[in-house]
Amino acid sequence: MNEMIGQLGNLYTGAIADTLDELGYHNQCLPSDIRPLADSMKVAGPVYTVLGKRRHYDDGVDPRYRQMDMLDAIPSGAVIIVEPGNEFSAAHWGELMTNTALQRGAKGIVINGGLRDSLQILDVGFPAFRKYHSPLTAAYRWNIDSFHIPIKVGNVTIEPGDYVLGDIDGVLIIPQAIIQEVVEQTVAVATKEDVVRASLQDGGNIRELFEEYKVF
């Protein structure tokens, strides 16, 4: 399994998306406005899902304890995916959560919402994908409802056990049932693309190369 995750991490989303299309999975890309904090950032691995909802200042609950519960349950090697639900103003992730997640062995985070402490997160090199930035704390605005459960981000349903690959071009969810097939098929195509790329750079003809390798 670790070898397969390593192979997934060496691939890129465009190649994986093509394979998913060929296998009939046409709706696996998260919203296109979820972007990496730095262009070079990449995430790959099994998902750890988090679902939240808006809260009010005076509801008498300190949501930070629930946040700590969520952090304690992160499996080593997982990529955290946060769906904030109906809260669109606060930062749902920050520096201290990042450092705690690193302690737990998390490989990155994808948030369909807000991020703060961006420079500090860049300093520790934790791959983070987010929709927007906000200085506002989530403590008075947002609760974590549940984690490690099925969630929906945009139009994509994500199940515990699924896999994620994210890079500068976007974030893809790969269902657990087909992960091995997707990786193996994409590696085979990527090998052909490497040959075609080298041939083109050496003056090859794209039509002839396409007829031979069927990649373009």
Locate each region found by the language model:
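Feature captures the catalytic cores and cofactor-binding loops of soluble hydro-lyases/lyases
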Residues: 1-160, 174-216
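Channel- or pocket-lining gating/hinge segments that regulate access to a cavity or pore
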Residues: 170-172
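C-terminal binding/interaction regions
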Residues: 164
